[in-house]
């Protein structure tokens, strides 16, 4: 039996409260004779010591005779692909065709203090997890690629949109997970985009370093044990981009505890009596690495809105995350420049007219597609159109008012308004009616003409 040496390693976990040194390490100038290798006398001596025979022909040792390749000038490329159908592999070589990582050893290096039943259960759990992860990853990736290829055409996109309406009407018990059929749905939510946050780029910020101020006080130890490492100071912290010697990084600024409480009071109540400006002090520098999401929907921020009285109105608003950024503590590499900002004074003010207009327009134009001046001109045009419509409506209401005055006057004279209106309309029609036309063949003689005819 093979004997394996196992060492017992005890890992001591403790906090190191020592801060980093406030000064960079001392740079020592070590003489290095690098320049002598570029001198011409050194190269000449090197050539004399080591003679390398190089005999090259016209083709530099690589003769190319394309005429010897059959079918090359006719475009036949079958000579580039070798025929492997007639090759018989040796049984020993067939083992090389197995997929790497398909089967491996389940032996785990464990310390001698672990019990055997724990080791066996861990081996079985690790094997099952590897298989499930591999199957899930391959299946989900294949489904995503297949769906992406199928949705490249517009008719397929319309079909997918219509299918989404059918799925919403489908009973909850009939829903199935595409890759995990054992899961059963419990409740359904309406997934909708968060239009109020559509015009803003959101970043997922992850700090790899501990931001808590470590100390040996009793309160800090209690907060560390309870998990309250961050105080109110970090809730109102500021990031400022900085640069030094061609390198860019982020500077982190924090206020005091009292200032943080005053800032929150000022934000919650604009009329709060606080001392401005608020002073921020430099706390730490961070190196940032950013990964921009290619598709735009790799990371989503979900906001749940629950309605207990109407469960069908439950909504989940999603906001796409533009990029993920990781902040790591920046170590001191060079002397601190005199241009570094040690503190920031912050003052809060009310919104001006343009900013308030932008805030109001953001409710209807979340993407910021319209210009402020153009929007103001449109609003003025709408107001002028509304004014003209109001004038037309007022002119239409004037005859109605005169009609009411006429009716009231007729009632005082004892005449019914309906009969008087009919008489007025009849007289007006007679006065305004044209005379009947006179035909030429049916003209009647006047009385003078009749007397003359009788005397004759």
Curated annotation (Swiss-Prot):
A GO cellular component entry from the record: cytosol
Composition-biased stretches (Polar residues): 408-433, 441-456
A Pfam family assignment: Paf1
UniProt feature, compositional bias: Basic and acidic residues: 396-406
One example of a Gene Ontology biological process annotation: heterochromatin boundary formation
Sequence segments annotated as region (Disordered): 382-456
Location within or outside the cell: Cytoplasm; Nucleus
Keywords for this protein: Cytoplasm, Nucleus, Phosphoprotein
GO molecular function, one term: RNA polymerase II complex binding
Residues modified to Phosphoserine: 388
Family per similarity comment: Belongs to the PAF1 family.
Protein name: RNA polymerase II-associated protein 1 homolog
């Amino acid at each position: 039996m093979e004997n394996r040496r196992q060492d017992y390693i005890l890992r001591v976990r403790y906090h190191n409260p020592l801060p980093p040194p406030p000064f960079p390490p001392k740079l020592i100038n070590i003489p290095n004779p690098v320049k002598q290798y570029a001198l011409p006398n050194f190269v000449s001596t090197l050539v004399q010591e080591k003679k390398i025979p190089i005999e090259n022909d016209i083709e530099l040792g690589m003769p190319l005779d394309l005429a010897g390749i059959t079918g090359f000038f006719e475009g036949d490329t079958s000579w580039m692909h070798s025929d492997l159908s007639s090759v018989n592999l040796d049984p020993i070589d067939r083992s090389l065709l197995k997929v790497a990582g398909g089967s491996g050893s389940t032996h785990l290096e464990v310390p001698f203090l672990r019990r055997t039943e724990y080791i066996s259960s861990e081996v079985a759990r690790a094997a099952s997890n590897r298989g499930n992860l591999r199957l899930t990853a391959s299946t989900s990736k294949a489904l995503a690629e297949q769906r992406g290829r199928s949705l490249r055409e517009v008719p397929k996109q319309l079909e997918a949109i219509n299918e989404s309406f059918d799925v919403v009407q489908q009973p909850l018990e009939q829903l199935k997970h595409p890759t995990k059929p054992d899961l059963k749905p419990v409740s359904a939510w309406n997934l909708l985009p968060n239009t109020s946050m559509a015009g803003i780029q959101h970043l997922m910020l992850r700090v790899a370093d501990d931001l808590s101020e470590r100390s040996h006080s009793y309160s800090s130890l209690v907060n560390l044990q309870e998990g309250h490492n961050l105080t109110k100071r970090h809730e109102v912290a500021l990031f400022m981009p900085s640069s030094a010697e061609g390198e860019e990084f982020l500077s982190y600024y924090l206020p005091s505890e009292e200032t943080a409480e005053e800032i929150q009071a000022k934000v919650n109540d604009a009329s709060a009596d606080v001392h401005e400006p608020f002073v921020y002090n430099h706390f730490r520098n961070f190196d940032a690495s950013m990964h921009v999401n290619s598709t735009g929907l790799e990371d989503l921020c979900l906001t749940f809105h629950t309605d207990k009285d109407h469960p069908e109105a439950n909504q989940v608003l999603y906001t796409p995350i533009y990029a993920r950024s990781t902040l790591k503590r920046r170590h001191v590499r060079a002397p601190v420049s005199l241009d570094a900002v040690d503190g920031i004074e912050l003052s809060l003010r009310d919104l001006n007219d343009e900013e308030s207009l932008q805030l109001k327009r953001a409710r209807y134009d979340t993407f910021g597609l319209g210009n402020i001046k153009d929007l103001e001109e449109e609003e003025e045009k709408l107001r002028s159109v509304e004014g003209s419509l109001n004038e037309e409506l007022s002119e239409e209401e004037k005859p109605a008012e005169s009609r009411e005055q006429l009716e009231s006057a007729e009632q005082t004279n004892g005449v019914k308004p309906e009969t008087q209106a009919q008489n007025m309309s009849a007289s007006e029609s007679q006065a305004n009616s044209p005379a009947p036309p006179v035909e030429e063949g049916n003209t009647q003689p006047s009385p003078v003409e009749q007397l003359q005819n009788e005397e004759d």
